[in-house]
Amino acid sequence: MVGLIDTFKEATALQCRFIEKLAQLDLKEVNAFADSLASFLGGQGDKKFVYGLAAGRSALSLYSFLQLLHNHLDVFPCTMEDPVQKHFRKTRNNLGIAVSGSGETPSVNKYIEDIIGQGGEMRLITANKDGTAYRLVEDYENGSVLIIKGRTKYDTEGGRISKLSPMGTEFELEVLAFLNAIFNEIPGRLNGEEGESENRSCDRYKDAVHDFSDQCHLISKMDPERLERWFKRLFPRSGRYVVGGVGRSGLVARAFEMRFTHLNKTSYWEYDFNTPSFQIGDVYVPITGSGNTYECFQGVRNAITNGADVMPITTNPSSELVELMNLLGREEDVAFIPVKPEYYDIFSRSKETSTWLVSEYSRMRYPIFEINASIFTNSVVAVGAEFLGMEEAGMKRLHA
């Protein structure tokens, strides 16, 4: 198992480099992107609709940002499940934000064309200047494009160590971190900070990127013996994998569940309509920073009652979920995501909710756990690919 721990650490270190790349983006482009968002959000009118146009894990990275906009600002978010034609009204302020690494996702390009055809504003984040999405938005007078040169599933670059960068991971992770970092720049612009766009230093953005990078390095220092036991419990099983989470943690969970499919495992998102009941041999993997999320806690009880294993991912050792796992003698089945000491108190203050409604605390807190959980689960996938003898080519064949 030493080789697997090395793979975990190398995969985590690689993702740290992905995050650190964001600090090297052209600040003029970062400023322009932040200004364009602030211009829309600070414009006249109280009916602001933001359409998130993306697919797969890119969509989950974008939807996390939409939650931030909805929680902190007076914005109504729409996703690809809410077609543009259904919600778009010219009496509203409409902004489409598209994320497409290749720029060739048909459904995304269709909705980009819809928004352009209706005269709405359009922003695109892509890795491909030669893609269709880039051409559509770059040629549009109310559109702008930001290039993040991250690897996508369409890349054929042979110089990368594929086992440490499962296809599609780099671009989606960088988009997730970028959008969470750029959000810190928006309030100052809405409050009328002085200075021309090109002269702004983007200190809040850069501080967030450095913070994400520091947090990422903590993951590579997780207890190797505990990780080894966790891997041994997680991978060698023939039962079904059920992954769950709520809010932004739920978006990370959905991305993680997709990767089990690529590892040729039978997996389900907990809240899908076709998710079966737990049975002996299954494993439930709830992802919850606080460890007190009502839905996850109830999912744990349900799984245990029906004979399934439970392997939570959390950051709060004093949570009710961890207390239950300790009571059952299954404390070794918990994976603890490390965060800086100053953040532990934030998670320990979160109390269990009594309904599906997310607490005010949970909605407003800094999304550091979701960034770390994304990095951790990506590294777990790299370990799983090696443990199960999966080659990247085989994983691609299982990719939608």
Residue ranges and their predicted role:
Residues M1-L25, E198-I219:
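Generic N-terminal amphipathic, Lys/Arg-enriched alpha-helix
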Residues I5-C16, V30, A34, L62, ...:
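A general structural signal for well-ordered alpha-helical segments in protein cores
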Residues A13, R17-Q24, G42, D74-V75, ...:
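Generic secondary-structure signature for well-ordered alpha-helical cores
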Residues Q15-F18, F33-S36, F65, Y111, ...:
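A ubiquitous structural signal for well-ordered alpha-helices
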Residues A38, G42-N184, V246, L251-A382:
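Glycine-rich phosphate-binding loops that contact phosphosugars or nucleotide phosphates
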Residues A181, G188-D207, S379, A385-A400:
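A short, charged, Gly/Pro-tolerant segment at domain boundaries
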Residues L41-G42, K47-A55, S197-D211, H217, ...:
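Glycine-rich phosphate/diphosphate-binding loops and the adjacent beta-loop-alpha structural elements
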Residues A23-D46, L218-R237:
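A short, well-structured juxtamembrane/interface segment
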